Amino acid sequence: AYEIRLSLVGSEMSIRDRDIERLGCKVWGLELFGRRSNQTLRIYIDKNEGISVEDCEKVSKHVSKVLDTENDFSENYMLEVSSPGLDRKFFYNEQYKDYLNEPLKVTFFDSQNKKTIQGRLEEVDKSSIKLEMKEGPMQIAFSSIIQANLII
């Protein structure tokens, strides 16, 4: 189990994975964006059987309660809870290993250039992924990945 801590409009909150697991789901990832006075917290949840509207509603109610009661948020915020979708974005290195041999789109820094490539996920180790492409294999360090998504 892990704990995710983030700063939202000047206050700190934590979302414990075990709390979401008690609701039958796991946290796939978090995004925080928007202006300071009107931020959006997007939480992606997942489970083996797929996510239902009811799952999103349960998690949303739980997280809203945490935001509204355990923290003093004086600014407006919007909470979104959803499935990561078929073209899911990867948030954590551990997520890649379940998608071996699947096609990925990866945006990363190569030296000082930003590149986007597509290939089949061939290998995952502690520090990188290996994609098989038409031009041959390419190893990409996790530290250089900006964003990676499944291709549907």
Language-model-detected regions and their locations in the chain:
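Short Lys/Arg-rich amphipathic alpha-helical segments
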Residues: 11-12, 16-118, 122-152
